[in-house]
Amino acid sequence: MKVEDKQRLERTEKMMVRWMCGVTLKNRITSEELRNRLSIEAVTEIVRRGRLRWFGHVERKADNDWVKKCTKVEVVGKVGRGRGRKTWLQCVNSDMKDLGLRVGEAQDRQLSRRKIFGETSEPCLH
């Protein structure tokens, strides 16, 4: 996810939370305080958890599975000038670093879930 997309998502979320609470910027109440009142978490954290959950799912697949092969593919050809786009795997690696996860821990489903979702919270399974 691009930084611009992340900022747009956060901005929209803040607007919606304020609208749900009937609060304007003139009331000088922080969005964090409103989120705590409603007991909701930031949408960027939900996206991060989903990304890490999908990574664990892919890592537990067999090595010859096409989904796993697609995550490891490297495109051959000329490389353009400048810094390249951040890949999905780079994003996952930075998320894992933030949470103190290692790639090998994705094999242990219970351990990775505890680290991703926290000790007490469980994901909503429909």
Task: Describe the residue ranges of each PLM region.
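Short linear motifs embedded in intrinsically disordered, charge-biased segments
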Residues: 1-126
